[in-house]
Amino acid sequence: MLPFIRSDLAQFTAYKPHPSSDTDAAVPAQLDRLDTNESPCDLPPELKQKLAWTFQQVIESNRYPDGGHEELKDAIAQYVNESANISSSPITAANISVGNGSDELIRSLLIATCLGAQGSILVANPTFSMYGILAQTLGIPVVTVSRNPENFEIDLTAAQSAIEQTQNPPIRVVFVVHPNSPTANPLTTNELRWLKSLSEQILVVVDEAYFEFSQTTLISELVQRPNWVILRTFSKAFRLAAMRVGYCVAHPEAIAILEKVRLPYNLPSFSITSALVALQNRAILLESIPQILNERAKLITALSKYPELAVAESAANFIFLQLKTDNKNSPDTALLNLHQQLKNSGTLVRQISGGLRITIGTPEENIRTLNHIQTALIKA
């Protein structure tokens, strides 16, 4: 390795945008790409035409984008208040920071809290992998606890013990997803009670990437909890994964710090415009959610009929599928075989932590997925 590179980076591997791919090449479009929790619906043609017109007539390619994001922040604040039914003490632009995807915001939060041996982070696996990955790339220790295998609730006893015993550096940030990825379960009453009990010295990051599908939010907690941050994204329900726009909602003092550490001009003009157009037309874009939820219910019902499979309830736009005990193969081997057979059949899903995470696709994609799973189980 080059002598000027940090030695701990030698153990890392580059993140594959599509983990189901054997190479770094882009996944062919003819495959059913159900491995990254994207929306199955592209933007409507009329919105694409509006964006094309904006690019041609309004955006000046030779000029830097709006680095303050004020118009976008105002629009986001309005949507947050509307979606959380907040009338008193409403969210304002001062409560919003915008990032190049939620990943940038996660990285900024880590820089603001833990960099320079100031803190560690706590995550409960399985969960969104980027919390740990981004922390490790910054040299920040990652403390992990497990989850209850039955309902995927965080092992709260282990989590509390980790917070009490971890020193030099202490745990400064706890990351949770609501609902969790890959297991699709929302935070439980016990988990919420524990999060609320944590010291204000600890930052609690609640990732609501799938809020539009769960319709369960903790935005109202921010008024009385200045140590809480809520993350959201335009990549899922708003169909803008290609534009990389995420945002967080937090106390104005926390937002002021994030604005200090984020990169200048971090969002391209086209991404800013796309997010604004999406918010202005949110009623149209969010019309796809009932169909996705209906398809999710149909997929869970169909898969639950197979005695070999355990299918968890879902509050997101994906399901978590596990294999029951197989006398022929170890659970890991059986899961690997199923994953590979699905891929060979043209269905990409995510293999992770003892199960398969399957994004809800179009009705046609879901039918093919069911057929491919059925065929794979017959061959097993």
UniProtKB/Swiss-Prot annotation:
- What is an annotated GO biological process for this record, any one? L-histidine biosynthetic process
Q: In which pathway does it act?
A: Amino-acid biosynthesis; L-histidine biosynthesis; L-histidine from 5-phospho-alpha-D-ribose 1-diphosphate: step 7/9
Which key words are in the record? Amino-acid biosynthesis, Aminotransferase, Histidine biosynthesis, Pyridoxal phosphate, Transferase
Q: Name one GO molecular function term.
A: histidinol-phosphate transaminase activity
Tell me yes or no: is Iron among this UniProt entry's keywords.
no
Q: Which cofactor does it need?
A: pyridoxal 5'-phosphate
Q: Which reaction is the catalytic activity of this chain?
A: L-histidinol phosphate + 2-oxoglutarate = 3-(imidazol-4-yl)-2-oxopropyl phosphate + L-glutamate
Q: Which CDD domains does this entry report, sorted A to Z?
A: AAT_like (cd00609)
The answer to keyword Transmembrane helix applying to this record is no
The signal peptide annotation in the UniProt record is: none
SUPFAM superfamilies of this UniProt entry? PLP-dependent transferases (SSF53383)
**Where N6-(pyridoxal phosphate)lysine occurs along the chain?**
K236
Which EC main class describes this enzyme?
A: transferase
Spell out the InterPro entries in the cross-references: Aminotransferase_I/II_large (IPR004839), HisP_aminotrans (IPR005861), PyrdxlP-dep_Trfase (IPR015424), PyrdxlP-dep_Trfase_major (IPR015421), PyrdxlP-dep_Trfase_small (IPR015422)
- Record-listed E.C. numbers: 2.6.1.9
Q: How does it assemble?
A: Homodimer.
The cross-references to NCBIfam families, in alphabetical order and at most eight, read: hisC, PRK02610.1
Q: Which family does it belong to?
A: Belongs to the class-II pyridoxal-phosphate-dependent aminotransferase family. Histidinol-phosphate aminotransferase subfamily.
In its UniProt entry, what is this protein called? Histidinol-phosphate aminotransferase 2
> To which species is this protein native?
Trichormus variabilis (strain ATCC 29413 / PCC 7937)
Gene name as annotated? hisC2
